[in-house]
């Protein structure tokens, strides 16, 4: 939550600085003033990549330490890698190795 608020604040500050720069450039006597102002107005922030959304039927069914629902992708028997015990991990590794060898 704090990251989103910080990002919004940073983008607002960037927009304010761009507006101030555009105003100062328009006051100056420069031949290519219009070109510079257009380029500054075209300045757009790059969109950040969002994390992929995992459907509910493919998510882990265990609870986290803070009693919340685990939203990590499930690997084996609807359990994510972090919630597997050693025997389940070994079974999963064996199944994966068999799948790789058959392909």
UniProtKB/Swiss-Prot annotation:
Keywords: DNA-binding, Plasmid. GO terms for molecular function: DNA binding. DNA-binding protein that recognizes the inverted terminal repeats of the pGKl linear DNA plasmids. This is DNA-binding protein TRF1. It comes from Kluyveromyces lactis (strain ATCC 8585 / CBS 2359 / DSM 70799 / NBRC 1267 / NRRL Y-1140 / WM37). The lineage of its organism: Eukaryota, Fungi, Dikarya, Ascomycota, Saccharomycotina. The gene is TRF1.
């Amino acid at each position: 939550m704090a990251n989103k608020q910080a990002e919004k604040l940073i983008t607002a500050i960037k927009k304010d600085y761009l507006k101030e720069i555009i105003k100062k450039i328009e006051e100056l006597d420069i031949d290519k003033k219009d070109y510079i102002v257009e380029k500054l107005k075209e300045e757009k922030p790059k969109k950040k990549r969002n994390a992929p959304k995992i459907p509910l039927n493919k998510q882990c069914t265990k609870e986290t330490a803070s009693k919340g629902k685990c939203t990590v992708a499930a690997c084996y028997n609807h359990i994510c890698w972090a919630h597997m015990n050693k025997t389940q991990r070994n079974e999963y590794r064996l199944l994966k190795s068999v799948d790789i060898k058959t392909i």
